[in-house]
UniProtKB/Swiss-Prot annotation:
Name by which UniProt lists this protein: Ribosome maturation factor RimP
Function: Required for maturation of 30S ribosomal subunits.
UniProt entry tagged with the keyword Disulfide bond: no
Biased composition (Basic residues): 239-248
Top-rank taxon: Bacteria
Amino acid sequence: MTDPIADSVAPDLLDEPRLVVEPGVAARFGAVAEPVLLAMGYRLVRIKVSAEAGCTVQIMAERPDGTMLIEDCEAVSKALSPVLDVTDPIEKAYRLEISSPGIDRPLVRRSDFARYSGHLVKIEMAVPHQGRKRYRGLLDGVEGDAIRIQREGVKDEDPLVLLPMHDIGDARLVLTDELIAESMRRGKQAERELKQSLGLAPPPPPHAKRSDPKKSNAPKPKPKPPVKAAAKPKPTNTKQHRLAAGRSRRGDTDLSEGD
């Protein structure tokens, strides 16, 4: 499985450039890895070279919809390893690690900021903006070449700030319950589509509708209180009623009743 999705991906999604590009050794790995990923239908997210286990090269990749399954990581590793062995971007031995972006993922493209609007983010600017380098708040979409952030706990100033995308040094999502729920939903959908493409799961019937996440995540209406049953009519043929009727016919007076 070396080319799982390339034929079904829109070219403009694959070719969208990253806003942040790594320098040095990581850039050399990126120059080799990115063409291979694009040919397979994946996008490069980030490359990190660390001293872990001697030397570890972590290549973070994703599908254009933001998902990345274990099978995807295995396919990328199988295709990329021999290419890196030939080009040899680094002289010493290293351990190659292919991974997904994760739930609290970095945001590296314009489409990332649009896709995760409404979620909590933390931003570190490469160039200070309004005298600050660090921002945290709700991502409120994209406006021109800037992102909108609704800052938390701001007093005596406008909580809304526009941050130029090309001045951002690092941006990532903050782990929340809402983000975890959305990530699980995306992962399950991607897994179903992969199994269907491999013939491991039957396709949905033609009349089946795909679930709308906005509707499924909407609060459910409160149940209406149960309707009280109508009161039973009082009996009119009891012994008391029959005695009263007899007295009425005889002209007797009911001494138990008041005036």
